[in-house]
């Protein structure tokens, strides 16, 4: 290629760890940032609620930053945004549901009105300095996840974000493997790929299989109250729980701050379809017998502050 400039890939978090995902890409006088997540403290980090990446380099070069590009709406990819965007002013790009979740955080931190934002569709390209970022459809445990093909003067970098290959997703389209194939044939300078659980044998089953499991559980426990702990952001799974609850004529209680917030956003954006009179408050539980209730809560990983533990 005729271009002789140097491309820098600068990991700021998320490598060899779960959480705090953040990577900067720099070419000449331009920087773009992919993801901006947090992680939770180790047991010996007393008095610390959360951990965010060290953004010293970005702070020192904030005039070069052309934008933040977010792959999906999990905390380990978006949780640091409110803190970072208070110091660094740059446009924010994400898909519809991801942006909706982010906007809730920005509003909570009272910076929503000062952050420039753009909702991006799959297949759309965003020009940011000498970078061109293409959004590609993927599947993950949250809707609207994206991979990026980052087109630079010296070649294409493919950043997968978190993903799984699900040929039979419950909602929406399957991962766009055809586009990844096209990029591969044309030549890729670097592949930055999710490697969570890569050393474990086997493969991740389709989310559709989880729905069948719910049906078995509900059929087996017709006289009991059912409590299901899951990630708040797993909108597809929450939808399957609600669908199953409706089939078995059960009311649904949602507990946990993050669960309530994300369900509210997803419902407003029509990523969740909940029939009228399905949801009830926790105070209304006493009006129903156990066999009429399903409780969806946070705390599936035993988090001490989650609703299930409390």
Language-model features, listed with the residues they occupy:
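Short, conserved beta-strand edge motifs with alternating hydrophobic and charged residues
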Residues: 296-298
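Loop/turn-to-beta-strand initiation segments
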Residues: 292-294
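His/Asp/Glu-rich metal-coordinating catalytic cores
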Residues: 2-69, 74-290, 300-310
């Amino acid at each position: 290629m005729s271009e002789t400039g140097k491309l820098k890939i600068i990991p700021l978090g998320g490598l060899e760890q779960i959480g705090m995902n953040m990577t900067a890409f720099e070419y000449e006088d331009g920087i773009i940032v992919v993801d901006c997540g947090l992680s939770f403290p180790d047991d010996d980090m007393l008095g610390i609620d959360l951990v965010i990446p060290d953004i010293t380099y970005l702070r020192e070069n904030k005039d070069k930053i052309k934008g933040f590009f977010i792959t999906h709406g999990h905390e380990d990819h978006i949780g640091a945004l409110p803190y970072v965007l208070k110091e660094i002013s740059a446009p924010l790009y994400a898909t519809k549901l991801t942006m909706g979740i982010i906007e809730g955080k920005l509003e909570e931190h009272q910076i929503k009105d000062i952050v420039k934002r753009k909702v991006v569709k799959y297949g759309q390209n965003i020009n940011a300095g000498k970078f061109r970022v293409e959004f590609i459809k993927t599947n993950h445990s949250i809707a609207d996840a994206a991979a990026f093909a980052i087109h630079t003067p010296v070649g294409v970098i493919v950043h997968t974000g978190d993903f799984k290959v699900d040929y039979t997703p419950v909602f929406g389209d399957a991962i766009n493997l055809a586009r990844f194939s096209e990029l591969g044939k044309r030549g890729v300078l670097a592949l930055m790929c999710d490697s969570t659980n890569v050393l474990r044998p086997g493969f991740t089953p389709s989310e559709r299989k989880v729905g069948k499991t719910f049906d078995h559980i509900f059929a087996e426990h017709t006289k009991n109250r059912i409590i299901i702990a899951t990630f708040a952001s797993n909108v597809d799974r929450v939808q399957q729980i609600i669908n199953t609850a409706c089939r078995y004529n059960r009311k649904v209680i949602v507990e946990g701050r993050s669960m309530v917030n994300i369900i509210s956003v997803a419902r407003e954006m029509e990523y969740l379809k909940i029939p009228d009179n399905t949801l009830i408050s926790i105070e209304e539980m006493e009006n129903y017998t156990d066999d009429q209730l399903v409780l969806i809560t946070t705390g599936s990983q035993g988090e001490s502050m989650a609703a299930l533990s409390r």
